[in-house]
């Protein structure tokens, strides 16, 4: 018991020492002035900027705008992606077309959508939302389609023998059985949505001047 306790404290101490060394190395490199201060600020300068941004409310405002973009884009991606994934699992033609497109687009880095968003929407909220939706959509489509295809057919047959109709089977049998796959796709879509939004917020203002 005591040995495990000291082992846990030792792991925490190692982590703390590591981060202290990282901050010290950061400060040391900053003091060397190899790079301009605006390219490589010191930890103290970063802390001061964050503190002043928090005090004047700009940090809170920027965080709220970012979260609003993220939640809205992610929500649209889910509302669009889950039904499309269901269609892919149900119809082979859609799987052979939209499914393949989704597989290809999912592999694209999020930043690839930024130039298109800028050309189509300019420096607007629409450009930001488009990039976030594209980051979310494809993972959700693929996960939903894969999950519904992997539901054992015996589940639906058992429900139909008890008088369940197609809609009831879909809502109460197929969707719950495929939930682990769908949730996994939602998690991946959330991670990709964050990554997409970061790329959009950095590059859209740059590309539009």
Indicate residue ranges for each PLM-predicted region:
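Transmembrane alpha-helices
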Residues: 130, 134, 166-200
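Short cytoplasmic-facing helical segments at TM-TM junctions of multi-pass membrane proteins
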Residues: 143, 147-182
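Transmembrane-helix boundary motif in ABC transporter permease subunits
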Residues: 72-102
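Glycine-rich helix-loop "coupling/hinge" segments at transmembrane-helix boundaries
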Residues: 118-120, 148, 196-209
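Hydrophobic alpha-helical elements at and bordering transmembrane segments
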Residues: 50, 59-63, 67, 97-104, ...
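Generic hydrophobic transmembrane alpha-helix motif, especially the helices
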Residues: 103-139, 146-147
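Periplasmic/extracellular loop-to-transmembrane helix junction in inner-membrane transport proteins
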Residues: 2-3, 32-75
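Transmembrane alpha-helical segments of polytopic membrane transport and secretion proteins
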Residues: 1-20
């Amino acid at each position: 018991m005591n040995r495990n306790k000291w082992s846990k404290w030792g792991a925490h101490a190692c982590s703390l020492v590591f981060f202290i060394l990282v901050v010290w190395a950061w400060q040391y490199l900053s003091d060397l002035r190899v790079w301009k201060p605006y390219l490589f600020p010191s930890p103290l300068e970063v802390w001061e900027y964050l503190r002043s941004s928090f005090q004047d409310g700009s940090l809170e405002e920027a965080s709220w705008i970012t979260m609003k973009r993220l939640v809205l884009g992610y929500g649209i991606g889910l509302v669009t992606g889950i039904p499309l994934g269901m269609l892919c699992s149900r119809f082979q033609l859609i799987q052979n077309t939209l499914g393949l497109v989704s597989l290809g687009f999912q592999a694209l880095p999020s930043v690839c959508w930024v130039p298109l968003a800028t050309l189509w929407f300019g420096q607007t909220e629409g450009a930001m939302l488009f990039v976030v939706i594209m980051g979310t959509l494809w993972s959700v489509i693929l996960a939903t389609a894969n999950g519904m295809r992997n539901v054992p057919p015996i589940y639906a047959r058992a429900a139909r023998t008890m008088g369940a109709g197609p809609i009831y089977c879909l809502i109460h049998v197929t969707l719950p059985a495929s939930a682990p796959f769908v949730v996994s796709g939602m998690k991946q879509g959330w991670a990709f949505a964050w990554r997409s939004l970061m790329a959009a917020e950095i590059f859209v203002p740059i590309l539009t001047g």
